[in-house]
């Protein structure tokens, strides 16, 4: 939810953000008009309440002869107060309705759509193979790590089993991420994967991409596509203590996505699936700390990608490709040899005060005044990392070298083909 104070003081900033996102700038004027009507309705209701209160004092001081007429006037005024309060509530509802149509105000992101990102950095050099590399599914099947056929039999398209060392490889990766998170001051959590509509809406996931979310109609609950949702809802309607610095959580959960808009895309293997596991970082901080925290999350992603030994690049995502809650987002993309391209492994977003304003999460400054907090999120490990790990570390004999950082968890240095 955007800041109405920012809207009033800098409407052109919000208009430009709408243009960068590819959204309608005319919404700015609609919201300004609705906000003005809301403020007028508040003043009108406040004035009538004050008048009614003064009238009550006059009645208490009136003589018995004067009271009947004054009581009649008081009742009439009471009706006017009720009508004014209804108008006030209606005006507020209209403001909220229009406000919910806005994405976050874009900050420093490049203009354009999905293909207009800016590459900020390349790390590592894509490997030159002296043999024809296999894709992750061929490797996963020959090594006994991935079973898509039985996953499809049981759950349908885009489901799979991780088996044997494949399960240990994922658990090792997630455990390594959890350790790194704890070393960097994050509190590990295993949060709910089902959340109420107000939490899903509060995080900005019930907008244009709501068809990507699984909804349990009988229970009025949503399955999360990321633990970001549950971690953002953790402090809903609370005033949190940021006097000792940011509050940092790392959520380990299964995640669920319908992939409704992805028909025909990445149907092979486990790159784009309906269920996967992920360790997600989430930070609450003061708004002025958010940019630095965003870089800190990106640096942790860098460390983790270095640990699993894959070449990658970092991109600055264009405004038109941002989710509604993000003011700016960096993606890290790993090199996938058999696709001859980079594919997204992680993202980290600065959501400024957008989510916390919707979820009413605040903190107090040194004077005791309450302010809306800022929130940020970033992925530290997830199932699709296995795609990059397997393909980049394969050998000519069909084996895969386990990255050194994962060997204590997997218990092997090399994964050998099953005979």
Swiss-Prot record:
Pfam families: Seryl_tRNA_N, tRNA-synt_2b. GO terms for cellular component: cytoplasm. One of its GO terms (molecular function) is serine-tRNA ligase activity. Belongs to the class-II aminoacyl-tRNA synthetase family. Type-1 seryl-tRNA synthetase subfamily. Pathway: Aminoacyl-tRNA biosynthesis; selenocysteinyl-tRNA(Sec) biosynthesis; L-seryl-tRNA(Sec) from L-serine and tRNA(Sec): step 1/1. The keyword Metal-binding does not apply. The lineage of its organism: Bacteria, Bacillati, Actinomycetota, Actinomycetes, Mycobacteriales. NCBIfam families: serS. It comes from Corynebacterium diphtheriae (strain ATCC 700971 / NCTC 13129 / Biotype gravis). It is an enzyme of class 6 (ligase). Signal peptide: none annotated. Keywords: Aminoacyl-tRNA synthetase, ATP-binding, Cytoplasm, Ligase, Nucleotide-binding, Protein biosynthesis. The keyword Aminoacyl-tRNA synthetase applies. This is Serine--tRNA ligase. Disulfide bonds: none annotated.
